[in-house]
From Swiss-Prot:
<feature type="binding site">
    <location>
        <begin position="186"/>
        <end position="192"/>
    </location>
    <ligand>
        <name>GTP</name>
    </ligand>
</feature>
<dbReference type="GO" id="GO:0005834">
    <property type="term" value="C:heterotrimeric G-protein complex"/>
</dbReference>
<comment type="function">
    <text>Guanine nucleotide-binding proteins (G proteins) are involved as modulators or transducers in various transmembrane signaling systems.</text>
</comment>
<feature type="region of interest" description="G3 motif">
    <location>
        <begin position="207"/>
        <end position="216"/>
    </location>
</feature>
<dbReference type="GO" id="GO:0007188">
    <property type="term" value="P:adenylate cyclase-modulating G protein-coupled receptor signaling pathway"/>
</dbReference>
<dbReference type="InterPro" id="IPR011025">
    <property type="entry name" value="GproteinA_insert"/>
</dbReference>
<feature type="binding site">
    <location>
        <begin position="211"/>
        <end position="215"/>
    </location>
    <ligand>
        <name>GTP</name>
    </ligand>
</feature>
<feature type="region of interest" description="G5 motif">
    <location>
        <begin position="334"/>
        <end position="339"/>
    </location>
</feature>
<dbReference type="GO" id="GO:0005525">
    <property type="term" value="F:GTP binding"/>
</dbReference>
<dbReference type="GO" id="GO:0005737">
    <property type="term" value="C:cytoplasm"/>
</dbReference>
<feature type="binding site">
    <location>
        <begin position="46"/>
        <end position="53"/>
    </location>
    <ligand>
        <name>GTP</name>
    </ligand>
</feature>
<feature type="lipid moiety-binding region" description="N-myristoyl glycine">
    <location>
        <position position="2"/>
    </location>
</feature>
<dbReference type="InterPro" id="IPR001019">
    <property type="entry name" value="Gprotein_alpha_su"/>
</dbReference>
<feature type="region of interest" description="G4 motif">
    <location>
        <begin position="276"/>
        <end position="283"/>
    </location>
</feature>
<protein>
    <recommendedName>
        <fullName>Guanine nucleotide-binding protein alpha-8 subunit</fullName>
    </recommendedName>
</protein>
<keyword id="KW-0547">Nucleotide-binding</keyword>
<comment type="similarity">
    <text>Belongs to the G-alpha family.</text>
</comment>
Length: 364
């Protein structure tokens, strides 16, 4: 009996040992999978001024703690600069469009703004305030009948939407106790130079979100560094089909965006990467399509000059550039400054990145 009991005990111990080994192996596998997905990397790409930085701001507002009073104070100086640069852009548009000022003093007002801008750039942050002279010059300048007309027809003259917004809110912004709202920050523009990294915890995963400068030289310099990202979020502006690049006035922005998307989508660095497409600035596109056909950039378009048909054509043009038919392109039509709408879209993007990563490491 003793020998029998000993044999049974041995068999039980052996089975338990095997189970324990398998259990330990399972834990090790889980830990290895956890290690592989410990940090999820999302790379945001697209041409300059397409809405990449705005999307990251939205993620910070929706999923993080937003902006502190100190951060808002820093952003205030950038908003002042946006206004000053916006006035200069309007002045340049007057010349490009062969328009004339109705008020002869408008030249004096623009010169006042220009001189102030040069000093503003050199000043310390503590001194970066809009003084009464430049405030008066801006207020009188935008009352010129030619300028007022151009501001009303902003999409015809391609005046930046943020410039319109800040001028509409100018009386609030020039108050001494002014502190930017979240909407002000979303509308503000700060060109991305190099790579901006943003760290955030989303749905119990550590995310690293990278915003690469949209200008050509910036992209060429950094793209090869990101061959291990889980997903690429490509953002293009729907409304800039009749505009040219800031860095090259011979290149149409929509054509540049299509060419860039094709290179990213089929490039060797991102063959196994989830690809997400934001067709951004739909709000401005709906306005512009009423007076300017997309044929100025996409000559093969034969459909009607209306939003739905033109949008569908642009969408199909982008999707057709994907040569990897096993990979789906997750597409969204967006307005990056609309927090309520973009919240739903960003949640979808986060889910795509997580699911794609888990599938790659064998969890699903």
């Amino acid at each position: 009996m003793g020998a029998l009991c000993s044999s049974e005990t041995y068999m039980l111990d052996k089975e338990e040992y095997k189970k324990q080994v398998e259990h330990n192996k399972s834990i090790e596998n889980d830990l290895e999978k956890d290690r592989k997905i410990k940090i999820l990397k999302l790379l945001i790409l697209g041409p300059g001024e397409s809405g990449k930085s705005t999307t990251i701001k939205q993620i910070k507002i929706i999923h993080d703690e937003g902006y502190s009073a100190e951060e808002k104070m820093v952003r205030k100086h950038g908003i002042y600069m946006n206004i000053l640069e916006g006035i200069e852009e309007i002045h340049l548009s007057v010349g490009r469009e062969n328009k004339s000022y109705k008020n002869p003093l408008s030249f004096d007002h623009i010169n006042e703004v220009r001189m102030f801008t040069e000093n503003f750039k050199k000043a310390d942050d503590s001194e970066k305030l809009l003084g009464p002279e430049v405030i008066n010059a801006i207020q009188k300048y935008i009352k010129d009948e030619t300028i007022a007309m151009m501001l009303r027809d902003k999409t015809v003259y391609n005046i930046d939407d943020s410039t319109i917004y800040f001028l509409e809110n100018f009386s609030r912004i020039i108050q001494k106790d002014y502190l930017p709202t979240e909407e002000d920050i979303l509308k503000s523009r700060v060109p991305t130079s190099g790579v901006i990294q943003y760290k955030i915890m989303l749905k119990n995963f550590n995310f690293r979100i990278f915003d690469v400068g949209g200008q050509r030289a910036q992209r060429r310099k950094w793209l090869h560094v990101f061959d291990d990202v889980q997903a690429v979020l490509f953002i293009t502006s729907l409304s800039e089909y009749d505009q040219v690049l800031r860095e090259d006035a011979t290149v149409n922005r929509m054509k540049e965006s299509l060419n860039l998307f094709e290179k990213i989508c089929n490039g060797r660095y991102f063959l196994n990467t989830a690809m997400i497409l934001f067709l951004n600035k739909i709000d401005l596109f709906k306005i512009k399509i009423k007076h300017t056909n997309i044929t100025v950039a996409l000559t093969s378009y034969k459909g009607p000059q209306e939003c739905d048909s033109a949008l569908d054509y642009i969408r199909k043009r982008f999707i057709s550039l994907n040569k990897n038919k096993k990979r789906s392109i997750y597409e969204h039509v967006t307005c990056a400054t609309d927090t309520e709408q973009i919240q739903v879209v960003i949640d979808s993007v986060i889910d795509v990145v997580i699911q794609h990563t888990m599938q790659k490491v064998g969890i699903q």
